Amino acid sequence: MLQSRNDHLRQTALRNAHTPALLLTTLTEPQDRSLAINNPQLAADVKTAWLKEDPSLLLFVEQPDLSLLRDLVKTGATRKIRSEARHRLEEKQ
């Protein structure tokens, strides 16, 4: 019960625009990056590093760079990722 409450509080902090950048980066575990990727407090260099490490996070970005999205359509790790990237690209164009 305590673990699930802590998880809930951490996930709320990841989404909250008022969470300080240092705390945001510290709280974020790899599986939670999709929640935090759109937080305006997240430093641009951290976001860039995350996207370089895991390009599929681009699917969770509200305003993705279209050239990066095109690359993901071509080089996504799985068919599902490539398909979702193609769908997002069609929406944005």
UniProtKB/Swiss-Prot annotation:
It comes from the Bacteria. InterPro entries: DUF2773. To E.coli YdbD C-terminal region. This is Putative uncharacterized protein YkiA. It comes from Escherichia coli (strain K12). The lineage of its organism: Bacteria, Pseudomonadati, Pseudomonadota, Gammaproteobacteria, Enterobacterales. The gene is ykiA.
